[in-house]
Amino acid sequence: MKRDPTKGRKTPDHYARKAKTEHYPARSVYKLQEIQKKHNVLKPGNAVLDLGCFPGSWMMFAAETVGRGGKVTGIDLKKVATHMPAQATSLQEDIYEIDREALAGTLGPLDVVLSDMAPDTMGNKFTDAARSFHLAAAALDLALFLLKPGGHFVCKVFQGEDFQNFVNMVKAEFERHKVFKPETCRKDSKETYVIGFSKKESTHVGS
């Protein structure tokens, strides 16, 4: 019997095919679209930071949403090669090592910080969740430094032992919060998104 060469091979799902048709570099764009449709975190004219921006789907959608009067800056370890609207730029940086004072001087106070960062998974759910928590905590720390009062924060984090701790961290710094898992997440995925709405006045930009 001949071996089926397609057996065990992952085939692109509906959202991956749709992304290709609509000229987005990855299916992850539809997660942000769902978040935007449900929670309206992005507004025309907003200044936005996208952490973990590679390959550029969130940057592209955010730039389209904020329009030419807005600005979107992406940061990732990998270089983004996707062609972007004029109001979007990317930096190849490590979030753990970036000079946030210099970044604040370049970007100014932000309206929204997005983070779709995820660790390179090891196949151990406890290790993967712990590494995701540390990335999310780093994203939150940077967001609190850069966001203006009233600004919003959207962050991916894996469910695990530290998940509720992270939710509580966001809850403490924002007027309200929401835990949201887009329908476009893969069924077996442990990822979810924690959204902080309206950064509290007591958490100062650049503090």
UniProtKB/Swiss-Prot annotation:
Name listed for the protein in its UniProt record: Ribosomal RNA large subunit methyltransferase E
Location of region: Disordered: 1-20
PANTHER family, sorted: RIBOSOMAL RNA METHYLTRANSFERASE, RRNA METHYLTRANSFERASE 2, MITOCHONDRIAL
Subcellular location per the Swiss-Prot or TrEMBL entry: Cytoplasm
Keyword Disulfide bond included in the entry's annotation: no
Function: Specifically methylates the uridine in position 2552 of 23S rRNA at the 2'-O position of the ribose in the fully assembled 50S ribosomal subunit.
Cysteine disulfide partners in this protein: none
Record-linked HAMAP family: RNA_methyltr_E
Binding sites annotated in the UniProt record for S-adenosyl-L-methionine: 56, 58, 76, 94, 116
Protein keywords: Cytoplasm, Methyltransferase, rRNA processing, S-adenosyl-L-methionine, Transferase
Catalytic reaction equation(s): uridine(2552) in 23S rRNA + S-adenosyl-L-methionine = 2'-O-methyluridine(2552) in 23S rRNA + S-adenosyl-L-homocysteine + H(+)
Organism annotation: Desulfosudis oleivorans (strain DSM 6200 / JCM 39069 / Hxd3)
Gene Ontology, cellular component aspect: cytoplasm
Catalytic residue positions: 156
Chief localization: cytoplasm
Record EC number: 2.1.1.166
Family per similarity comment: Belongs to the class I-like SAM-binding methyltransferase superfamily. RNA methyltransferase RlmE family.
An MF annotation (GO) of this entry: rRNA (uridine-2'-O-)-methyltransferase activity
